[in-house]
């Protein structure tokens, strides 16, 4: 509460409390890590409640610790019906000599306190009392805290049930404050982080979160404080590189900015250097994946430099994988490097147990004996052991695992402890350990590691937040780096709060309070997922401070310049309200401008700077609002090279409703000795009077302040009457000048020699707003293909348009009559009837009229715009296309030749494909009909059709920033011929039904299977012998559809089908036998491909087909369909394929063959539930093959049960289902 609200104190205060309760019994113990500095209480006795008529009262002050405390009372409530009571501390104050007011000695004062406020009845305090408790961080912004509704007024004044007496004893009342002042161990206890300055409080800054990359922020902070690593990064040569495509330079800059910046940084530059687009920046990736890719990229950049191999020295350890025979002296071992370790969390209590599990030996005996060289099958022990750990050890805790029951990734939230210090020697090879810990080094243990980084995830698998806890040096002080903010934390916040939490029984959860439940949920979902340990004996070396001299000079120079530029810009923003920017325009700028309006401006999106051939632009003049108009006008003339003695007029410009920037009215000031601010106020007053009458609207200080904030720039046109076209024509007629067409030379001549030119009585005339109009004229020359400003006219409203035409015809020495058009706005160009007057044609001051230069010879170029209307259309819809040579072709019709890698040009968005191809051919030096053009959007590539318009492949309401890059490919056949071919994607399966390669081809619709295989053989790489054993089949909606053979063509293959191919000797042989069977129409098998509704057919159709080609004596097997699904037969996924059944083969052997062809690992395949669907005379039978003993399954022979095209079903989760089209693999491209 401010001091001006205080009404003086009433009553008295005394130490202690009339309520027989200790502070400890009232205020709960907050935290064992938070020290209590002081606790005390005081009581305010109010002598007569009934005399409290004012809204607010203060108690006398009572000193506790370094503060004087008082109680604020709102007896009638603070915007409510209850009594409001607050507690307020007052820090030590001093006199501010500037303002004469008392101010805190420490402006950043704060006090963390637990407190309670109690009311009690004097004389009966032990029995009649009410106490509420809270806690708060008191500071200069939050000076008081308490209870807005401590007690209802009626309850205060009258007895209630269970309380025979009121709180008032003959009007008196006691209000007691209990205060416990706590030591703030971190500097942020109960902090709301408003106006929090991380750099000021901790000396460190964080990163802004640009999307889903807070895991990147955490990893960068961890690397930044691995100071030896930071020095290595600084030693990579980057002087001649760009941060946009150099990961080392971007990392150097990020690290140095973390050293010197006072504000949080963003990671945009770094992610750009990775080659990531916006989508990748907003995609959740795995921190371990990023860690390894980043290290690999840096390692490559360090090759050939003094720091080559240094990353291995600090981050790479060695482990030995071994198989050791028990009964013979034989061991097979392999030593491998590791950058980090993935440790299991589930079912383990702590880090020690995870390491024990990591090196746990597996016994190989029985059927799993090891085939030892020279010794045959032997019992053996299999495992891994460590030979060395790196100085900086990254441990990835497997908090995220795939759960087959839920068919998705889940987070392991169980409690898992990690120590501050760990001895890893128990996990090291004994022979290595003996050599390391010899007698000379027994005092030093290189396997003792101290924790320095904890990367934390709070949330579940789909949502959450990442932050990191870091101990920057050897000092025992931890900090939390949470995106933009950094603050100190306690040991408990580092360890216990990030262990996770075991799931509690539902019965216990149901008994929790709301606050307890929230804390339980937070604790359970907040856990460490990565730990960074540093070898104890190398801590000082690895964490030695990084000096300015360690940073490359070019990084220091550039970053310092950027900081200075940012500070300058921030200063400009702070002082912007003191200035107005005058954007000055003249006829000289107009005659050089090609485009809509007079010249380019901020509100105009159809202009590109590169189209401004002359380079002339508006002139910006930044002036203080306190500058006198006389000085401003002098500066304008000086800036624009106009002699000071020339008489000019200043026109205000503004945007019309159609967004065109045009002249509005001349600026007329009674005096030039007033300031710009005063002139703006007068202008505002005139405007208000025009809108609201003579009395206008009273101007207030708030209005003036709003004016200061809103009027930051003014567009002004400087009318020079001596450059008006009628005046120029008179000078030409008087032979005072040789031409009347404006150019830079003529403008300069007239400005300089005007007194000499007007001696004969020819005087320039200003356009006045009520008698004449100021019109602007443009000319279009078809020969030069340019539409430029021609000049301006000061014309009477009753003047004929034909008079203007005659003057222009004379200026350009033409005998042909001109046709004029009014440029209303982009897309609206109206022809003007020349017999009308200016008034009748509805042409007003600031309007633009255009004409076409008659008799011009069209140039021998392409494209050509023959008329002014054609050119206006081009201006309205022109776009700049950037082309590159297409390098992603997967088809055989592309040819390579020496053509430019990239080029760019302007063209109309409504250009037909033939015109676009013709433009590309000029740069690619090939015939346009042999070009294929591709629009490259982030979500796909789109090949332009030969019958299309360019606009068909642009976004609706596009602007220049939304034009995609384009690519071109030179074809060996004309595009129109190629378009008659059909695109086909072949998913080629090599060794399994899990992984495939996708190939794209263009084929004719009449292609058969053999023709197609002949076409693709070279690209895929199979032999002639293998070609005979290839099966091609289609799937639709994950269901088998049919086989492709020479009896049908690709015309019969549905566009919605997926085409698969694999070398399958057994299945291919059976299929050929089926084709040879008498009285069997092979086409019936392929009918599945012809029917686009095949996926909707019931199983009986396929069974009928199978029975139609039932086994005969010539058959040596059967073909069945394998279908994948999860839980429900309709929930299909994966590839549906054919599989052969062998006579007399038992089910376990059939299952082994299916496993080998399917391709999953033994562990994963064992989780698949198999069942069959087969046809009988009674109908289709579905039978599960689960729950049978091995002896029972040995008696099952599928060949005897199933017919051709019956089904084997595989019930298992779809491992790719959760991978959307946006889940792209992580890659650093630069």
From Swiss-Prot:
It is an enzyme of class 3 (hydrolase). Keywords: Cytoplasm, Hydrolase, Peroxisome, Protease, Thiol protease, Ubl conjugation pathway. Gene3D superfamilies: Apoptosis, Tumor Necrosis Factor Receptor Associated Protein 2, Chain A, Cysteine proteinases, Phosphatidylinositol 3-kinase Catalytic Subunit, Chain A, domain 1. It catalyses: Thiol-dependent hydrolysis of ester, thioester, amide, peptide and isopeptide bonds formed by the C-terminal Gly of ubiquitin (a 76-residue protein attached to proteins as an intracellular targeting signal). Changing residue 214 to A: Abolished deubiquitinase activity. One of its GO terms (cellular component) is nucleus. Residues 39-179 form the MATH domain. Residues 205-536 form the USP domain. The active site is at residues 214, 465. Pfam families: MATH_2, UCH, USP7_C2, USP7_ICP0_bdg. GO terms for biological process: free ubiquitin chain depolymerization; poly(A)+ mRNA export from nucleus; protein deubiquitination; proteolysis; regulation of protein stability. PANTHER family: UBIQUITIN CARBOXYL-TERMINAL HYDROLASE (PTHR24006), UBIQUITIN CARBOXYL-TERMINAL HYDROLASE 7 (PTHR24006:SF644). Present with 2810 molecules/cell in log phase SD medium. Interacts with PEX6; promoting association with the PEX1-PEX6 ATPase complex. This is Ubiquitin carboxyl-terminal hydrolase 15. It comes from Saccharomyces cerevisiae (strain ATCC 204508 / S288c) (Baker's yeast). The lineage of its organism: Eukaryota, Fungi, Dikarya, Ascomycota, Saccharomycotina.
